[in-house]
Design a protein with these regions (language model features):
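Alpha-helical transmembrane segments and their immediate juxtamembrane cytosolic regions
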Residues: 1-245
Length: 245
């Protein structure tokens, strides 16, 4: 089971990587009519994938499929599995020029670091502190015995996490991180197995138990995705064949 937990922990970086990449690539975008047309391709692909998914569900599961269900399934983002990401991305895309204005108006690196600390504290940090049960000694030896935890820091803004990842992506594009690649790789591997061991402990004696710490606003995916993004960014592609690029 431990290997499966390691894999589950590692794969939790999937969505955060896309959000980091969005901030990294779109940090210079400005408000204009041309900008808004940029989402057209994404929406077209989404509609096509929704159509394909609904046809499959109709054939394989007997789900209702007609013009009405297709329109409603597209508009409410239920026709295609994991459509929630497109729903989130539409909002992030619309906000991006304004987020860029806010980020760009900060005068120096220190102010931008304060911005990152603020959004990370509001969205990511709660998943580090609000996950323990201090009311039961038995819980510490058997964490699967109860799902009750004490809140230690505010968590209302956790749903704001896409914007936190976006700003981190903006910062990485502008400043990067001054750390040796080898050190970063060691830190990534160490963090992966540390978090996996923690997740194994939290699930010991039963099937895998998820929690805020491993959700996309959790501290585990945040640390792993930022380190992995920085490592991928340092891969030199100049001498790679075009097919590999």
């Amino acid at each position: 089971m431990y290997i499966a937990v390691v894999m589950r922990t590692l794969f939790s970086v999937c969505v955060p990587l896309f959000m980091l990449l969005t901030g990294y690539l779109m940090s210079k975008k400005e408000l204009s009519k041309k900008y808004y047309s940029g989402i057209t391709k994404t929406l077209v692909v989404f509609v096509i994938s929704t159509l394909a998914c609904m046809i499959y569900k109709n054939i394989a599961q007997g789900d209702v499929f007609d013009l009405k269900s297709f329109i409603l399934g597209t508009l409410d983002f239920t026709g295609s599995n994991y459509s929630w990401y497109i729903e989130m991305y539409i909002g992030l895309f619309l906000l991006a020029p304004f987020l860029n204005l806010a980020y760009g108006k900060l005068k120096n690196k220190k102010q931008k670091q304060v911005l990152l600390i603020t959004v990370v504290f509001l969205t990511i940090v709660p998943s580090l502190f609000n996950i323990f049960n201090f009311g039961s000694l038995d819980w510490w030896t058997n964490p699967t015995s109860s799902d009750e935890f004490q809140k230690l820091v505010p968590s209302w803004w956790q749903g704001f996490y896409p914007v936190a990842y976006y700003f981190v992506g903006c910062y990485i594009r502008e400043y990067g991180l001054k750390m040796k690649t080898r050190t970063m790789l060691i830190l990534f591997v160490f963090s992966l197995f540390l978090f996996s061991t923690f997740n194994f402990f939290r699930s010991y004696g039963t099937t895998f138990k998820s929690g805020t710490y491993i959700y996309w606003y959790g501290f585990e995916p945040f640390v792993l995705s930022v380190l992995l993004f920085l490592l991928i960014k340092r891969i030199k592609t100049e001498n790679m064949p075009k097919a590999a690029k």
